[in-house]
Amino acid sequence: MLSGGEVDRKRVGEIVFADRGELAWLEALLHPRVVDEQARWRTEQTAPLAVVEVPLLYETGGEARFDAVVVITASEEVRRARTEVADIMERQGRLLSDDEKAGKADFVYVNDGSLEDLDAFVRSVVQRLAP
């Protein structure tokens, strides 16, 4: 799995997404470390607003660590066009639905438009959140 100090992410994905026990083991190993690293990083920030991307935020109960949550999603067609993962539906099957995430979020954006549209959304969120 390790080659020259690098992780073969594709192979790890094949293993853990084929065996829920292996996935649980990996998540139990990684998630506490990621949370600790995010907390350390946040203490170092001096800007009035800091952004953290957390792919499994709601699934891991992590939303309580943040003042606001922004959910950015896209239609299934757009997701398929943007990903190289062949078994995306298997992986998405363990996630909350977009509707559930949107219902919990403070801000929601469906990213099916242009980069300019996304930039405008981000600017509007920053304007509302920045002191």
Model-derived features with residue positions:
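Residue-level signal for inorganic ion chemistry
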Residues: 26, 51, 109, 118
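C-terminal non-catalytic interaction appendages of large macromolecular assemblies
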Residues: 75, 87-102, 121
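C-terminal alpha-helix
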Residues: 124-131
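Short alpha-helical
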Residues: 21, 33, 77-78, 96, ...
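Phosphate-binding beta-loop-alpha motif at adenosine-nucleotide cofactor sites
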Residues: 103-117
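ATP-dependent small-molecule kinase phosphotransfer cores
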Residues: 1-49
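Short beta->alpha linker loops
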Residues: 7, 29-30, 74, 96, ...
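ATP-dependent NMP and nucleoside kinases share a basic, alpha-helical "lid"
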Residues: 35-44, 49-82
